[in-house]
Amino acid sequence: MKMKFYKKYLLLIVAVLFIYSCDSSSTSSYSVDNGDDNMGGGSNNTELPTGFSKFISEYTDVYVSGNYVVVESTGVPNHSSPYWGAGHPNYATPHSGMSVNPNVISAQNFKFYIPLNPSISGSVSSTPLGPIGVSISGVPFFNQYAGPNNQPLDNEIPSFDYYYGHPQQTGQYHYHWEPRYLTTNDSSMLIGYSLDGFPIYGPTEQSNDQYPSNLDELNGHSHSTDEYQEGTYHYHATSTSPYLLGGFRGKYGSLNGGGYYTN
């Protein structure tokens, strides 16, 4: 009698443990935040869009938070430059004709909030001075102007290093142009994202390695890409102004959680 009782008791314990273990199992398999950044609600069971897998993990941290993809980076380039300063392991001597500005690369604390589901806005928004997007290496993109009142970039271009970047006064290294280090071997690759959530590609098309002939005034157009098989609006780097993007085609996010604009 005692043996039968113990067997029934043991079977009951095993059954309870099995039910509990099934009930508490986790299904999450990707980097998702709980939305504590106060940048909007939304499902936390959202997978990163395919294009964001191209970000270089050594230099960026990419995850979903509410309605945003968040890209964290220090903004330092993954290549050599005279702007590292003499004595730095990544220091490079200035190339011929370069006019080095007095600034030195300094690590930043960037947190780009990029709309998870970008959409075309009813009107175009002007890009501000400062970061307007981020490259897959974590270096920010700046617009086509050198300063307030739409100062042309012409006088700053000689200060670009070999890979077309330079730092501003606080050491923020950035690209106004195509990031040459990324596109040297593939001029059609995805090079980053605008703050409005739309991808930015190199100067040529992935389908034929030709320069696009139908870009709009913002350097963008729509069709399928390797990362967006069903098609998407996207920008292309060009050798003439606006170089990367001439404005935000979509509703844009922010840098370091400064708000979400729905113009």
Where are these regions (language model features)?
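Bacterial N-terminal signal peptides that target proteins for export
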Residues: 2-10
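C-terminal motif of bacterial Sec signal peptides marking the signal peptidase cleavage site
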Residues: 18-21
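Solvent-exposed N-terminal domain segments of exported/luminal and surface proteins
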Residues: 25-154
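Short, low-complexity cationic-aromatic patches
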Residues: 103-105, 158-171, 218-231
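Extracellular/lumenal glycan-associated surfaces
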Residues: 110, 114, 135-140, 169-181, ...
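Short loop/beta submotifs within extracellular cysteine-rich repeat domains
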Residues: 122, 141, 181-186, 200, ...
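Short helix-loop boundary/capping segments
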Residues: 153-163, 168-211
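Long, compositionally biased interface segments
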Residues: 215-263
